[in-house]
C-alpha cells in the first residue's frame, strides 16, 4: 500500500470513529458498566465478537540457545455465543521470528486454540461479572520452527470483572474505574519432550526438555471516560476523547514444577482503548517485568468488532436460548 493510500485509509477510519455513536447494546455489559475487550488478558464476559487483527512486536535479547532478534505476531480471535451465557472462542496466529533459534528467519502459523466460556454470574447493581472457562490448545496444528508445541495444552480458568459504580457519591470520580482479571492453569498434556541424537562416537543421546505446569494470572485496570461523561459528570470532553478508556494490564506466568518453579515471567501493558458502538481500537506498550522476560519495550495493537451490535438479529445473536 502506498503512503498516499495509507493516509487516505487512516483518515477514513478516523472519520468513521468520530461519527460512530457511543455505547453497546449487548457487548460486555453489567448494569451501566460497559467492559471493553482487553488486549492482553482474556475477558470475563460471553459475547459475539471478532478481534482481527491483533498485532504484536518486540525485540528479544539473545541467550545461550538463541541469538538476539525480533518477534512479530498477528492473530485473530472469533467468539460465538451458543447460549446467552455460554460461548465458544476460536483463535489462531501467525508468527515471524527474525531470526529463529536455528539462526534463520522463520515464519508460520501457531497452534489452533479453542475456549469454552460460561458466564455464571452477573450483577447489574454491582457491575460485576464472573465466568469459568476451559481452553484447549491443539498440539501439532502449528509450525514447530516458530515454537508451536507438538502436545496439547489445557487451560482451565476463572475470570472476573467489576466496576466501581456503586461507590458513594463522595467518591464519584472513582466510579469510572473498573477491574477485570483471570486466574488460569496452563497444563501441558506431556511432561517432557525427548530428543534423540547420535554423539561423535556413535552413541545414542537422549535430551529431555521439561514442560512445567504454569499458573497464569493477570488483571486490567481501566478508567472509562464514557462512564464519566454519562453517569458521573459531563466535563465537556471533545467527542473523540470522551470515548477513550485508559488501561493498564498486568500479565504474569508462574511456572510451578519440573525445574522451572520460581522462574516468573510477565509484562506490564499500559495503553489506551477507543470504544465506539460497533468496534474498538486499542494500543498498548509491552514492558517486561524482569530480564528473564526481556529487556526491550514492545507494542501491541488491536481492531476489535462487536458482532452482537453489528448483527444483533443474525450473526450476533446466540444460536440457542435456554
Spans of features found by a protein language model:
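Low-complexity, intrinsically disordered short peptide segments enriched in small/polar/basic residues
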Residues: 10-11, 15, 117
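C-terminal segment of classical bacterial N-terminal signal peptides
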Residues: 16-24
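Transmembrane beta-barrel domains of Gram-negative outer membranes and organellar outer membranes
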Residues: 25-322
Amino acid at each position: 500500500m502506498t503512503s498516499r493510500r495509507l493516509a487516505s485509509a487512516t483518515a477514513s477510519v478516523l472519520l468513521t470513529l468520530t461519527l460512530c455513536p457511543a455505547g453497546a447494546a449487548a457487548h460486555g455489559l453489567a448494569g451501566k458498566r460497559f467492559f471493553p475487550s482487553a488486549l492482553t488478558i482474556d475477558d470475563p464476559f460471553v459475547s459475539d465478537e471478532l478481534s482481527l487483527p491483533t498485532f504484536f512486536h518486540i525485540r528479544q535479547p539473545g541467550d545461550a540457545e538463541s541469538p538476539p532478534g525480533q518477534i512479530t505476531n498477528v492473530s485473530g480471535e472469533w467468539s460465538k455465543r451458543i447460549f446467552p451465557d455460554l460461548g465458544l472462542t476460536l483463535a489462531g496466529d501467525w508468527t515471524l521470528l527474525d531470526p529463529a533459534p536455528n539462526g534463520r528467519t522463520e515464519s508460520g502459523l501457531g497452534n489452533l486454540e479453542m475456549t469454552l466460556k460460561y458466564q455464571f454470574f452477573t450483577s447489574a447493581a454491582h457491575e460485576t461479572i464472573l465466568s469459568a472457562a476451559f481452553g484447549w490448545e491443539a498440539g501439532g496444528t502449528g509450525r514447530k520452527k516458530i515454537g508451536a508445541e507438538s502436545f496439547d495444552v489445557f487451560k482451565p480458568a476463572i475470570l472476573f470483572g467489576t466496576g466501581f459504580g456503586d461507590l458513594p457519591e463522595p467518591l464519584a470520580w472513582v466510579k469510572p474505574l473498573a477491574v477485570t482479571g483471570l486466574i488460569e492453569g496452563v497444563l501441558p498434556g506431556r511432561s517432557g519432550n525427548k530428543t534423540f541424537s547420535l554423539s561423535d562416537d556413535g552413541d545414542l543421546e537422549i535430551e529431555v526438555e521439561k514442560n512445567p505446569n504454569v499458573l497464569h494470572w493477570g488483571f486490567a485496570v481501566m478508567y472509562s471516560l464514557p462512564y464519566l461523561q454519562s453517569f458521573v459528570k459531563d466535563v465537556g470532553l471533545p467527542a473523540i476523547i470522551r470515548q477513550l478508556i485508559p488501561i493498564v494490564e498486568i500479565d504474569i506466568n508462574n511456572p510451578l514444577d519440573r525445574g522451572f518453579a520460581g522462574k516468573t515471567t510477565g509484562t506490564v501493558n499500559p495503553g489506551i482503548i477507543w470504544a465506539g458502538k460497533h468496534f474498538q481500537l486499542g494500543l498498548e506498550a509491552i514492558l517486561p517485568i524482569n530480564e528473564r522476560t526481556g529487556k526491550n519495550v514492545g507494542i501491541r495493537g488491536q481492531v476489535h468488532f462487536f458482532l452482537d451490535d453489528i448483527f444483533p438479529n443474525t450473526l450476533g445473536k446466540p444460536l440457542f436460548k435456554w
